[in-house]
Every structure is written in structure tokens, then in C-alpha cells.
Amino acid sequence: MPTSFRFALLTLFAALPVLAQGGGAAAQEPDLIFRKSTTFRLLTPNDKLATYGVDDPVVQNVACHYTLPERGGVAGAFGMAEQVSDVSLSCQQVGPVTFKEKFAQGDVVFQQSRSLFFKKVQIVRGCDEKRNVLVYLIYSDKLVDGSPKNSTSAVPLTPWGAAGDPPKCADWLKK
């Protein structure tokens, strides 16, 4: 094998973990709230459930918390484990809601790579115009083969303190 080909191949494999991190519409890092071990492994990291928090980048004072499994073992220790797709989500209003800009139904709030092989988890937002409720959906998918694992959370827009009437999410939808 020629030296230049070997070097190119080695460089590609070294860059894969960086490429797998992804970017996306919402490039914020989630806040790790806590991890809880679910499977004990003697010499390698345990399997865990991890709970994270993220703020909606467009809707001020709405926060989402999600929990997903993180594989341990040898493959998990080196970031090579195929992560399972199970996810759960809870979003809530944490202050008076204000919108920074208009948004479309299904806009990405947050996304993150979950494996070396193009699986990602993402949170998207919608607006139930009739009920004035923001609806958040988290799901995990692969580049080729999607996943039915998902969870939904609804945030009714309510008055906060002396702020008066809450904004109507329908007024902020791109049409």
C-alpha cells in the first residue's frame, strides 16, 4: 500500500470522531444534568441513562430536558458503540415567553450526533395554533434507516407574573 494512501486513510479515521459530532441548526451544547448507571461492568464504563437540558434558541424561557441511554463497555469508552434510539422529553415554560424570530413548523431546536455511523438525535418545534401550545418532538434517526423511537412534549403559553397576556405562537409562524 503506498505511503500517501496509508496516510490519507489514517487521517480519515482520525477525523471521524470530529466529523461525527455534527453541527446543525442549533449548535448549542446540552447541559448534562446527571447520569445514572444501569448496567455494571467490571473493567469498562457502565451503561448509563443521561439527562440533559437545552434552551430553545428562538423561544426565550422555554427549556427542554431529555434522557437517553449511553452505552458503556469497550466500544462505549472509545465512542464506537452504536447507541440505542430510546429517548424521552419534557419541555416547560421557565419564565415569560418571548419569540426572537419567526419559525416554521418542524424547525430544529437541537441536534446531536449519537454514533460514529451517522445516527443523530434531534428536537424539533411546532405550534398548535388552535390551543396556543408549543409542541416539541424528540427523535433519533440514521442517515439510511429512520427510527420510530420518539417522545413529544407540549408547552402551553401562559401568563407569567405581571407580564400580561402570553404571546400567540401562531403570530410567529412563517407562512
Predicted segment positions?
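Bacterial N-terminal signal peptides that target proteins for export
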Residues: 1-11
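An N-terminal low-complexity intrinsically disordered segment enriched in acidic/polar residues
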Residues: 10-14, 45
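C-terminal segment of classical bacterial N-terminal signal peptides
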Residues: 16-24
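N-terminal secretory signal peptides
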Residues: 27-88
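Low-complexity intrinsically disordered segments
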Residues: 30, 98-175
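Generic structural motif
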Residues: 54-56, 69, 94-96, 141, ...
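Mature extracytoplasmic domains of secretory-pathway proteins
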Residues: 61-128
